[in-house]
Amino acid sequence: MENERKYSIKVEVRTIYLPDQSDPEAERYVFAYTITINNTGSVASQLVSRHWIITSGDGVTREVRGLGVVGEQPLLKPGETFEYTSGTAISSIAGSMKGSYQMVAEDGFHFSVEIPEFILSVPRVLH
């Protein structure tokens, strides 16, 4: 329980469909997602890598792994927040993403932050 308070990262996600970058005829739907990462723990921690599982509504799944996020490996002191925007394309009007961040605390402790599944969905258009 003590480690949960010591190494605590909160993740919030907002998504938006990007119609200008999408091509429905080619089954390409592009979304931007903005992620806010807040260190709610008591130890400074650095985001060192990410792992995403991206699933289209048609069942196509792909995994993405890499160092940091948007070219950075942010170090978050207790109470600090880091926000970034990135994007992805899927082959259907709806899908989802989930994943994790791998973190290293300033005391050398390695831990993973789960990113709960969130929905990517083209808004309905009323005529």
UniProtKB/Swiss-Prot annotation:
InterPro entries given in the database record: ApaG_domain, ApaG_sf, Uncharacterised_ApaG
Database matches in PROSITE patterns: APAG
Name of a matching Pfam family: DUF525
GO biological process, one term: error-free translesion synthesis
Source species, domain of life: Bacteria
Domain ApaG: 3-127
PANTHER family associated with the record: F-BOX ONLY PROTEIN 3, POLYMERASE DELTA-INTERACTING PROTEIN 2
Protein name per the record: Protein ApaG
